[in-house]
Amino acid sequence: MNSGINPKEKDYELARENTVAMNCHFLVCGIISIAYFVEFLKGDGTLLYVLATIILAMGPVVGEIICYKKQHDTKMIKHFVGIGYAILYTFVMFTTNNHFTFVYVIPMLIAITVYNDFKYSLPIEVGVVIVNVIQLALFFKRGIYTKADMASVEIQFFVIVLICGIQLYVSIVAEKLNQKKLAELKAEHEKTEELLT
């Protein structure tokens, strides 16, 4: 990804945020794609499953790149990142037998903090918790987890709830701090205007 952002774009800040989110999304999805391809080479997954995973991982990234080439400060990139990764994460969570797959969401939860947008983060965080609860129920139903695994279940649940809760808290605080800074800048600008007139 390049960061050839024009400072004269309508929303320079969104363009910068998009660059960071895209780079993180590309990195995470690239690593997941490679990991699943290696699993296929080892004989641990079917070609169809691996191809589906790679398409779900890299498809939104391609969409982001296309949007970015047209306009760096488009809100579409933000939605490709959030919705695209949510679809991949849900697919992987519901089709795996691996106890640790839930951690795939952590890097992207960190990445979306760049937007400092509570309204954007809230449905993502709630979705992550719901997907994890459903996956835990599926693991019990399939016999992957039993009562003997309750410590692992509790760890997964509480880690996800804590990360999502903290991410939402950080989004709220960062958004308020940004609004305060903007209000202070506006007040200073108005004072300067008064002095000049």
Describe the function of each predicted region.
Residues M1-A15:
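Short, Lys/Arg-rich, polar N-terminal cytosolic tail immediately upstream
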Residues N18, M22-H25, V50, I155-L162, ...:
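Alpha-helical transmembrane segments of integral membrane proteins
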Residues V20-N97, Y104-I110, V128-I130:
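Hydrophobic transmembrane alpha-helices and their membrane-interface boundaries in multi-pass
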Residues T74, T113, Y120-E125:
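Alpha-helical transmembrane segments and their helix-entry boundary regions
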Residues F91-N97, N132-F157:
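Interfacial aromatic-anchored transmembrane helix boundaries in multi-pass membrane proteins
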Residues F94-H99, N116-K119:
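Transmembrane helix interruption/hinge and helix-loop junction motifs
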Residues P123-Q135:
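Juxtamembrane non-transmembrane "cap" segments at the membrane-aqueous interface
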Residues D149-V161, G165-T197:
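HAMP domain helices
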